[in-house]
């Protein structure tokens, strides 16, 4: 959020930015060292660093330097997605962070298209370049500006026409990183090099770096082994970039400009791992169970059954509770999880989603208690039947919200283009119906559900399986993507590291096998029974494997 002037204590007429003059930069890393010293940045993470990119073939070679850091965007996505206002934009345009408010959800890292944010290993909170705000507020320049021996870093108020930065911006043609993301970055480069500005010009995992070991991107990998495992040469290998269908840019016409490799860069690991796809599955199942039962009873698809209501209610509550537990488990500061309710930032779909989850849990919990009391004879069944439609119809939009709110959260993750699919809300809703139908089929194996309920569940399950298969193959991966970054992530799922998760896990195990089992059950007359339950289990496993690939693959694509 933008802080009011009286709270931030800064001049709202100012707009601070940086200019990096690549004509002067010698790649000495003095700025990186000064930043670490001034801000006490721990080892292993960086607020500013110098990226080295080499182009050409010996003897026609050249090394390009690029000082990389937070862009202090005029339209910062990290601020919008932060659920507790730990990331905020000052009135003078500086994007600042408040470590005391951070819960370590890592959403800001997914929202930043520049890899500028990291989790401090000592505090477990998000941090980044903050324009040395403690110095700026007393009239001093950032430490990196002061220490640069070539005056290659220029900082100042871009709204002041007499400032050096304003004059440089007026006189020189400048470039920024990823202008297509719509963040309006305020870190400008004079003589910016295309190969350095575009992180997708080379593969993410290099074979080696100057002065640094290459850390594995994934747990269990050894050093540079990640590149071989992925079947690519990595950034350390010299690669031709003439094919514009494969890479986003085409470098000149000379031989020396058609080869590129990254000699040094700061290394970044994936912020989100298995708990996120697991929570997508658990909340989808819980919401799907309630939606199917609520719609079925409300629209008279099947008669109400007290035992089915009790079991459906407790399963929904437990699954949404497990969803909440997974979300808290994934926080780097889980002890602060209540901050999302005590100091919410309402533009964030993390904050909105938390309220939806809590509201849905409370409503379903009360409904389940009433149904349990009526089924046990503690309350008159007629009294509960009177209020039942109110709970079911109020719960339906909340259940749909639980199923799809993550699509809007992913849309705020500006650093992961594949997640910003306009089909994602519908896709998550279909997956929820599929998972809910599968849950009822497993329930039917252990308890005698009314036949109409079982048939409704298997019908919804089959239709949702077919719809999900169509949306996955045609909608998400069959239609050209809007950006090269999204296309690379989709390629990673279809043909790269996650191809087995996708084809054998999602498509074969999660869709083809369940549909085949349902067909066999229909032919032999066992449409509802153990065959359907096995199909449901296959669908659950396939759904998790798909969500795992969908969450992890976009994080493979580098942002810096």
Where are these regions (language model features)?
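Flanking helices and flexible, charged tails adjoining ferredoxin-like Fe-S electron-transfer domains
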Residues: 1-9, 53-69, 100-101, 109-111, ...
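Ferredoxin-type iron-sulfur electron-transfer modules and their immediate structural context
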Residues: 1-95, 100-105, 109-111, 115, ...
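Membrane-proximal soluble regions of multi-pass membrane proteins
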Residues: 181, 186-191, 328-338, 555-560
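N-terminal signal-anchor module of multipass membrane proteins
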Residues: 214-220, 240-302, 548, 553
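Long, contiguous internal "core" modules enriched in hydrophobic/ aromatic residues
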Residues: 273-274, 278-285, 299-304, 344-348, ...
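Membrane helical hairpin/interfacial module
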Residues: 292-295, 301-356, 363
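C-terminal ends of transmembrane helices
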Residues: 326-336, 406-418, 547-551
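A cytosolic-side transmembrane-helix exit/cap motif
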Residues: 474-483, 550-560
């Amino acid at each position: 959020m933008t802080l009011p002037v009286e709270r931030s204590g800064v001049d709202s007429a100012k707009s601070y930015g940086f200019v990096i003059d690549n004509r002067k930069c010698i790649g000495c890393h003095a700025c990186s060292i000064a930043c670490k010293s001034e801000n006490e940045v721990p080892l292993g993470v960086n607020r500013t660093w110098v990226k080295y990119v080499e182009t050409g073939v010996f003897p026609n070679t050249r090394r390009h330097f690029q000082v990389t850091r937070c862009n202090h965007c005029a339209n910062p996505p990290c601020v919008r997605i932060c659920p507790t206002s730990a990331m905020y934009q000052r009135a003078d345009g500086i994007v600042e962070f408040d470590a005391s408010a951070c819960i370590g959800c890592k959403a800001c890292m997914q929202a930043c298209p520049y890899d500028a944010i990291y989790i401090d290993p000592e505090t477990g909170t998000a941090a980044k370049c903050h324009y040395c705000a403690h110095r700026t507020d007393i009239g001093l320049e950032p430490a990196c500006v002061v220490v640069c021996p070539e005056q290659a870093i220029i900082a100042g108020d871009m709204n002041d026409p007499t400032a050096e930065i304003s004059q440089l911006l007026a006189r020189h043609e400048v470039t920024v990183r990823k202008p297509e993301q719509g963040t309006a970055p305020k870190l400008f480069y004079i003589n910016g090099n295309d190969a350095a500005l575009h992180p997708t010009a080379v593969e993410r995992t290099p074979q080696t770096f100057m002065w640094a070991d290459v850390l594995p991107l994934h747990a269990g990998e050894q050093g540079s082994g990640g590149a071989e495992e992925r079947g690519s040469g990595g950034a350390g290998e010299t690669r031709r970039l003439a094919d514009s269908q494969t890479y986003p840019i085409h470098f000149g016409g000379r031989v020396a400009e058609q080869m590129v490799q990254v000699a040094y860069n700061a290394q970044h690991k994936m912020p989100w791992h298995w708990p996120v796809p697991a929570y997508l599955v658990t909340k989808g199942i819980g919401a799907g169970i309630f939606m199917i039962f609520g719609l079925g009873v409300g629209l008279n698809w099947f008669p109400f059954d007290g035992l089915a209501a009790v079991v459906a209610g407790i399963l929904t509550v437990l699954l949404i509770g497990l969803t909440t537990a997974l979300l808290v488990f994934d926080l780097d500061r889980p002890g602060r999880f209540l901050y999302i309710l005590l100091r919410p930032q309402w533009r964030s779909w993390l904050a909105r989603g938390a309220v939806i989850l809590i509201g849905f849990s409370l409503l379903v919990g009360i409904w389940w208690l009433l149904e349990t009391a009526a089924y046990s004879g503690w309350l008159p069944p007629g009294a509960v039947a009177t209020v039942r439609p109110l709970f079911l119809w109020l719960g339906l939009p909340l259940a749909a919200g639980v199923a799809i709110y993550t699509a809007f959260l992913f849309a705020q993750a500006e650093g992961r283009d594949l997640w910003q699919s306009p089909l994602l809300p519908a896709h998550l809703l279909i997956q929820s119906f599929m998972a809910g139908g599968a849950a009822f089929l497993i329930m039917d194996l252990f308890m005698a559900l009314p036949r109409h309920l079982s048939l409704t569940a298997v019908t919804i399950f089959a239709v949702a399986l077919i719809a999900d298969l169509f949306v996955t193959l045609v909608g998400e991966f069959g239609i050209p993507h809007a950006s090269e970054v999204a296309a690379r992530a989709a390629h990673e799922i279809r043909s790269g590291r996650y191809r087995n998760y996708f084809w054998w896990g999602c498509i074969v195990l999660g869709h083809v096998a369940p549909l085949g089992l349902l067909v066999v059950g229909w032919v032999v007359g066992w449409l509802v029974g153990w065959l359907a339950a096995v199909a449901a289990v296959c669908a659950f496993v396939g759904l998790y494997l798909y969500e795992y690939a969908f969450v992890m693959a976009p994080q493979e694509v580098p942002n810096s």
